[in-house]
Structure formats: C-alpha cells, structure tokens
Amino acid sequence: MKDPYDVVKRHYVTEKAKMLEGLSLGGGEGKKKGSFCKDPKYTFVVAGDATKPMIAEAIEAIYSNKGVKVKKVNTVCVKPQPTRIFRGKRKGRTAGFKKAIVTFVDGHSIG
C-alpha cells in the first residue's frame, strides 16, 4: 500500500462539505425525511489514481488514534473550470482533482 498521505492529500472544506458534515449532528431525527443522517460524512481531496479500498485504508490509517471505521466511500472527479486571468485578457483553467466523500460508521467521527 502507498503512504496514506500520498492517497489522501487534504481535508476538503467548502460550504457544501461543511453542510454535509453538519447533517450528522442531528442524530437521525428530523422533520423531513433525509434532513439528518446518523452516519457522519467527511470530504477529502485524494490522488487521481486512488481507488475506493485504498482511500478507506488510508483514512483508517491516518485517523487510527481515533479508532474510526469507514462504512462507505464515494468518489467524484471534479472537472477543470474555465477562468479569466489578468482582467479577462488571458483565459485559463483551474486544476481538476478527485474528491472522496467518506461515510463513517455510526458513532465514529474525526471532529
């Protein structure tokens, strides 16, 4: 297996990712179906060639001191987006990357 820090690059922090983490704080009860979930979910930026089993092993190795268990891993390849640089004169693209949404077993958390 590769070094876990080569597979998982960093924690991915956006408004949508934080909202997804916050859904697990409700304990599974909510007025609407699906408004809360029991299993906590966290988002990470991973290597482009990483597979789901590799990501699960790396997350469990990195957070072994907290004793987390991975239940499920979903991956998304984010495409590069067009940008304008230098007052719109030059056109470019942002870098594409792969992100993983990791679901932990109920009761396990990294936060």
UniProtKB/Swiss-Prot annotation:
GO molecular function: rRNA binding; structural constituent of ribosome
GO cellular component: ribonucleoprotein complex; ribosome
Domain of life: Bacteria
GO biological process: translation
Cited InterPro entries: Nucleotide-bd_a/b_plait_sf (IPR012677), Ribosomal_uL23-like (IPR013025), Ribosomal_uL23/eL15/eS24_sf (IPR012678)
The entry's keywords: Ribonucleoprotein, Ribosomal protein, RNA-binding, rRNA-binding
Subunit structure: Part of the 50S ribosomal subunit. Contacts protein L29, and trigger factor when it is bound to the ribosome.
Function: One of the early assembly proteins it binds 23S rRNA. One of the proteins that surrounds the polypeptide exit tunnel on the outside of the ribosome. Forms the main docking site for trigger factor binding to the ribosome.
Family the entry assigns: Belongs to the universal ribosomal protein uL23 family.
Record-linked HAMAP family: Ribosomal_uL23_B (MF_01369_B)
Record protein name field: Large ribosomal subunit protein uL23
Organism: Chlamydia muridarum (strain MoPn / Nigg)
